[in-house]
């Protein structure tokens, strides 16, 4: 009985092994009937047309007569290894000739200590991967306006937990240097602190310097929204003296700090205003009128030299913009308040509905006010722009230039006049 049982088990095992062997043979024969072809790096017309001229291959299956099937071209995508890379005009790299899209080169981030400034920390942040940085405007490297002093690219991020402001200084272009050779550096201030600053490394023999440096400012979360980041671009002359080429003022507002650090920001350089301050300070703003939309736009940029009333308590300043018609109030809007600065920066835009036939009797009143104790406001200065009926001098010129240049932002400084007592 035991011998019969062993014989049955042996037969079963032998049968299973035989079936496995037959299955393996059939699988191998089936796999050999298909061929895979990899296209060369550069596919030409002759190669692509050769598929139609391939001879038919026999396909045999077990127990089935030979059947001749046309070959099916299977394409393996070519790899990018071995491609030629060419350098573009803007300093980027691209694959030639198959891939015309530029691929940015990887940049190294370095540390640049400020001379004699130990209280503001500066450290190496690692390599900057340009693919992570998204430019907010597509025309950032084109369309330099007439009289442009240069353009600066940077990014900012505020880390709430560690109370650190991270600034990436990326590059500058189209710098206007009063010399044959250009050697530039950038100083970074966190206003209103003008004494301490951080400084980049000097870039020599180029008007389009690539900095790729990271800086850290330690600043409280309570005051960071009131701060202004200032970039000052200098040219180093033969006497090793620093000559200012232009500056960028970037307010650190909440909506700015909440953005993505990898979003690249660019700003055009502005010349330093060397005109003497007025008695009550000065206000800079832009005017624009869109006749198609019947929209009057005011951009409040900054003020300087304000005469703050320290004895009235809290020192924070805002600007109230009012649209008047026949000296009657129509509508008003106000900027956010900036704390503790006689040179506040706003960069806020307001729009008013105004028909073209109303511009001869309309005017704009901009009043700078200081917030005092009890949420009361005290006027520091005032300026009115409008037609000949209400204004003269620079204020009238600004209004007329706005009308001559529709849909364009016309920017000017204006001296504040004596405020009206509340």
Swiss-Prot record:
SMART domains per record: C2
Domain C2: 148-267, 279-400
Topology versus the membrane: Single-pass type III membrane protein
Transmembrane stretches, start-end: 5-27
Protein's UniProt keywords contain Electron transport: no
Function: May be involved in the trafficking and exocytosis of secretory vesicles in non-neuronal tissues.
Family: Belongs to the synaptotagmin family.
Quaternary organization: Homodimer.
Name listed for the protein in its UniProt record: Synaptotagmin-15
Organism per entry: Rattus norvegicus
């Amino acid at each position: 009985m035991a011998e019969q049982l062993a014989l049955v088990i042996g037969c079963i095992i032998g049968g299973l092994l035989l079936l496995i062997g037959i299955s393996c043979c059939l699988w191998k024969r089936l796999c050999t009937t298909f061929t895979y072809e990899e296209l060369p790096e550069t596919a030409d017309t002759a190669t692509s047309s050769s598929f139609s001229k391939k001879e038919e291959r026999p396909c045999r299956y077990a127990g089935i007569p030979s059947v001749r099937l046309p070959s099916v071209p299977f394409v393996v995508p070519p790899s990018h290894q071995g491609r030629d890379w060419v350098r573009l005009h803007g300093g980027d790299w691209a694959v030639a000739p198959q891939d015309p899209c530029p691929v940015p080169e990887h940049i190294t981030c370095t540390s640049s200590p400020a001379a004699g400034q130990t209280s503001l920390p500066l450290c190496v942040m690692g390599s900057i991967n340009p693919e992570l940085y998204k430019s907010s405007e597509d025309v950032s490297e084109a369309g330099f306006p007439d009289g442009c002093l240069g353009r600066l690219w940077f990014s900012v991020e505020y880390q709430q937990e560690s109370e650190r402001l991270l600034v990436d200084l990326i590059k500058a272009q189209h710098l206007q240097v009063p010399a044959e050779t250009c050697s530039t550096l950038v100083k970074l201030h966190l206003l209103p602190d003008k004494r301490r600053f951080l400084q980049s490394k000097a870039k020599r023999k180029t008007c389009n310097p690539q900095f790729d440096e990271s800086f850290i400012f330690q600043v409280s979360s309570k005051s960071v929204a009131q701060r202004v980041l200032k970039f000052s671009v200098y040219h180093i002359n033969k006497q090793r003296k620093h000559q200012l080429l232009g500056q960028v003022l970037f307010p650190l507002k909440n909506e700015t700090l909440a953005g993505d650090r990898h979003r690249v920001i660019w700003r055009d350089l502005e010349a330093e205003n060397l005109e003497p301050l007025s008695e009550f300070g000065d206000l800079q703003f832009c005017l624009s009128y869109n006749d198609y939309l019947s929209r009057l736009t005011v951009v409040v940029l900054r003020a300087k030299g304000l005469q703050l009333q320290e004895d009235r308590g809290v020192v924070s300043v805002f600007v109230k913009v009012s649209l008047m018609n026949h000296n009657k109030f129509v509508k008003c809007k106000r900027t956010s308040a900036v704390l503790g600065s006689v040179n506040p920066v706003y960069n806020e835009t307001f729009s008013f509905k105004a028909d073209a036939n109303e511009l001869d009797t309309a005017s704009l009143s901009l009043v700078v006010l200081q917030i005092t104790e009890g949420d009361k406001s005290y006027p520091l200065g005032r300026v009115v722009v409008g037609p000949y009926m209400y204004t003269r001098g620079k204020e009238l010129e600004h209004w007329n230039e706005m009308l001559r240049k529709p849909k364009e932002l016309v920017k000017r400084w204006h001296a504040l006049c004596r405020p009206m007592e509340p």
